From Swiss-Prot:
Lineage: Bacteria, Pseudomonadati, Pseudomonadota, Alphaproteobacteria, Hyphomicrobiales
Tyr recombinase domain boundaries: 104-301
GO biological process: DNA integration; DNA recombination; establishment of integrated proviral latency; symbiont entry into host cell; viral genome integration into host DNA
Name of this protein: Putative integrase/recombinase y4rE
Assigned protein family: Belongs to the 'phage' integrase family.
Residue span, Core-binding (CB) domain: 6-83
DNA-binding listed as a keyword: yes
Keyword field: DNA integration, DNA recombination, DNA-binding, Plasmid, Transposable element, Viral genome integration, Virus entry into host cell
Active site: 148, 173, 245, 248, 279, 288 (o-(3'-phospho-dna)-tyrosine intermediate)
Pfam family, one: Phage_integrase
GO molecular function, one term: DNA binding
InterPro entries tied to this protein: CB (IPR044068), DNA_brk_join_enz (IPR011010), Integrase-like_cat_sf (IPR013762), Integrase_catalytic (IPR002104), Tyrosine_recombinase_XerCD (IPR050090)
Entry superkingdom: Bacteria
């Protein structure tokens, strides 16, 4: 290994440790950075880290424009860290690889639309009643708790306290477990699902809380496929993007709308919502303030009436 590759490898590992200490999972990014070290070693590059070095590495993967932009973004932020130790490190341009399209804005469902989405679950796989009930319970939980879809499908039976209505969410996006209390109506729905699930699969293949029609853990792909079917049956497949993650946005927007209506101090309550949602930074939660035209209008009215205190 060359001296530069060794130096780079040491800094990459320290940078990964730093990101972990800040609460980030950083697994995919760590893989990209370690691959970059191997690339530098194979090419026998010497210091300093240059723009050309980074561009050639990113282009060596091929793939979609968004993948290249993501890899380059990981390197750009690492280069900023590396420059502290080697001032000759070249700064990478922010938009060297433009993304092919913007991420679609979240779609915030009305109460009627959410109800139609849940009602439509009964129409999928009518010969397998548990599948429809699984989707209905999942969608209700996503909408009422703001959990990420990945967090929901990873729930084990031991993570769901049906007596007290509390979920233990493990392996979150930022590597921290958290307790999530649910509403009494959600608790009742989870209890009903557990009874029906156990009747259908008295000897399940694993300890997952949500099961597929085969009796094993419902996968993220299974959730996406089921959601697409339900969306179509509900008449919401109308050209406007609707993803399971939009239910998380809806939860946050609904909660903040309620706080505005109650004339509560939303900024002071953001840390509470951030903890509940499992955000590492309050700024991530503040993003939801822009998630709804109605919410923006409400916040603007509060700011006007209260002299700027929203």
């Amino acid at each position: 290994m060359t001296a530069f590759a060794r130096f780079l490898g040491e800094k990459v590992e320290r940078y990964i440790d730093l990101r972990h200490s800040l609460g980030y999972a950083f697994s995919k990014q760590a893989g990209t950075l370690r691959a970059f070290v191997r690339y530098v070693e194979r090419a026998q590059f010497d210091a300093p880290a240059t723009r050309t070095m980074a561009l050639d590495f990113v282009l060596s993967f091929g793939g979609a424009a968004n993948s290249r932009a993501t890899r380059h973004g990981v390197l750009r932020r690492f280069y900023e860290y590396l420059a502290v130790y080697d001032a000759q490190t070249e700064a990478l341009k922010r938009r060297a690889f433009p993304r092919s399209r913007a991420i679609p804005p979240p779609r915030i469902l009305s109460e009627a639309e959410l109800a139609s989405l849940i009602d439509a679950c009964a129409r999928i796989s009518p010969g397998i009643p548990l599948r429809g009930l699984t989707m209905a319970t999942l969608i209700g939980l996503l909408a009422s708790s703001g959990l990420r879809s990945g967090e929901v499908v990873r729930l084990d039976r031991s993570d769901v306290d049906l007596t007290n209505g509390v979920l233990l969410v493990r392996k979150t996006k930022f590597r921290k477990d958290r307790l999530v209390p649910v509403h009494a109506t959600t608790q009742t729905a989870l209890c009903r699902y557990a009874r029906e699930r156990d009747a259908a699969f008295p000897s399940p293949k694993d300890q997952a809380f949500f099961l597929s029609s085969r009796g094993n853990r419902l996968s993220a792909t299974g959730l996406q496929c089921g959601f697409a079917q339900v969306r179509k049956f509900a008449g919401l497949d109308d050209g406007k993007t609707l993803r399971p993650h939009d239910l998380r946005h809806r939860f946050a927007v609904t909660r903040m709308s309620l706080w505005h209506q109650q004339r509560a101090n939303v900024q002071a309550l953001l840390p509470v919502l951030a903890t509940y949602l499992g955000h590492a930074n309050y700024s991530d939660t503040a993003y939801y303030l822009t998630g709804s035209v109605d919410l923006l209008a409400m916040a603007a009215e509060r700011a006007f009436l209260d002299g700027g205190a929203a």
